[in-house]
Amino acid sequence: MVALRLIPCLDVAHGRVVKGVNFVNLRDSGDPVELACRYSDEGADELVFLDIRASVENRNTLVDLVSRTAKSVKIPFTVGGGIDSVASINDLLRAGADKVSLNSSAVRNPDLVSKSSREFGNQCIVIAIDAKRKINKTDEWEVYVKGGRENTGIDVLSWAKKVEELGAGEILLTSMDGDGTQNGYDLHLTKSVANIVNLPVIASGGAGCLEDIYDVFIEGRASAALLASLLHDRKLSLREIKTFLLDKKLPIRPCE
């Protein structure tokens, strides 16, 4: 059985790790390289580094920061934010990233997904989907871009299926409604996407306790759980989380 993954997320703005609630009210959570090293040493399976201001400010993710971070860790590393060309993807992979995450640029230019998948292999291409539940709808979500500031009107489930057809290797699915709240993942959203694609789905947005993480693997059918506030605030450690999940007989890589 393929091991389930725990993935700390480093949201970066202006060179610092930040975290907010529902994509707003950002607060400083530390230096990205220091946090990357800490989580790598503590037993993270992978890392995700997202420059959350890049798409808004129309600038590329800082390759230097990616390089310094990647050189400091020994685990797979995904980088995203403002990546809008095959050349940019090449630069980031050469700088040390194992994968790249495409979001706004994939919606704007779907051909970028297929081109980059052919060029670098679909294992390198992660599609990030920022999903928000439609008002008064229990099972319909829309895709947001530009750091969660712009509603595309695109149905999340349709888009997930489309990016799979285009050649994506993985989906990073964020519930904007749950982001930073620590009230639990959106299990209905996660399961709905996981059920219609044959791709690993990384669940993001809302982890607040050990049971939330267990639930997103069992009920949400996620292949990986993204963790941010829970770890940055030191509410739980990766060792505590992994010990809990291993006791529940889930296929998790133990901390060394």
Swiss-Prot record:
Pathway: Amino-acid biosynthesis; L-histidine biosynthesis; L-histidine from 5-phospho-alpha-D-ribose 1-diphosphate: step 5/9. The active site is at residues 11, 130. Its EC number is 4.3.2.10. One of its GO terms (molecular function) is lyase activity. It is found in: Cytoplasm. Keywords: Amino-acid biosynthesis, Cytoplasm, Histidine biosynthesis, Lyase. The keyword Amino-acid biosynthesis applies. Its main location: cytoplasm. GO terms for biological process: L-histidine biosynthetic process. One of its GO terms (cellular component) is cytoplasm. Heterodimer of HisH and HisF. Belongs to the HisA/HisF family. PANTHER family: IMIDAZOLE GLYCEROL PHOSPHATE SYNTHASE HISHF, IMIDAZOLE GLYCEROL PHOSPHATE SYNTHASE SUBUNIT HISF/H IGP SYNTHASE SUBUNIT HISF/H. This is Imidazole glycerol phosphate synthase subunit HisF. The lineage of its organism: Bacteria, Bacillati, Cyanobacteriota, Cyanophyceae, Synechococcales.
